[in-house]
Amino acid sequence: MMFGMSASLMAQTAEPQHVSPFVESHVASIPSVPTQDISRPARQQGSIETLTYTAHRRGKTMTKRAQVYVPYGYKAKDKKVKYDVLYLMHGGGDNTTSFLTPPRNWFALRDVLDHLIEEGRMRPILVVCPTFYDDDQNIGANRMEDATAMTREFHTELQNDLIPVVETKYNTYLKGTDSLAVTRSRDHRAFGGFSMGALTTWYQLAYGVNAVRTYIPLSGDIWVYDAQGKKQDARTSAEWINGMLEKSPFAHDFQVYGYTGTKDIAGNPMKAVVEALGQYAPLFRYRTPDANLYFAMRENGEHFYGHINEYLYLALPIIFKP
């Protein structure tokens, strides 16, 4: 018996043949990003809100929080204007604040979003940053085995607990709160993550493709273990996730935009698994005119949020075209 494990929308999706050069379906280079300009606050700034919801896992009921980026110009009373939602998961040992309001000296994702939206390079969206841990203090995940289990199981919490709360509180495309309503609105939803958040992303694709159409794994490959706990190679990982997707009616209706760096600890493993997906996983179309798998690497890119937010600066205008 094997199970997958990985390292740590949208109203309209960009057609594969129209993607920008830096994310063509081969190992493309990522151009430089004007980080100094982006790090300055935009004139039109979105807001950061904290959302509380009730989550369930393994028989436990708990209160959890997520940070929500609400774009400039959002009007709660204007029900005619609806927004796509990006769910973005942090890396191991981090929390709900790591993307949008990081306590470090690199530019925050909120500034990236503000500038892209203000400049008209992407349409306004909601961005939700939850945690796979029980809370922001990493309670319940003192061991790596516990943390990886949480990432593997998060797809259930996303569909049953988080999406219904987020997407009924804000003006989105969700109509109802049951699983059918979530599935019907999947085209307006994306999921991404960094490091162990990429682990969560690959798991979401494998187990919950019915709820989300577009995926953004950032510096994280797919891990598969055998019954003895031995990590399998990239080919086995690719075949595993392909087999999981074959069980879904949405096996031919998803897109993956992957990014990493040449100096990232997850760089070569992620490159290997992407190439294996293209070779051994028929549901993943890579290096083809109708590609649904895209991958790019940043020269000297390392395993930290500063570079991850650069990848998002480049990816989001493709996925959330204005």
What label would you give each PLM region?
Residues 12-322:
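Non-catalytic cap/lid and distal C-terminal segments of serine-dependent acyl enzymes
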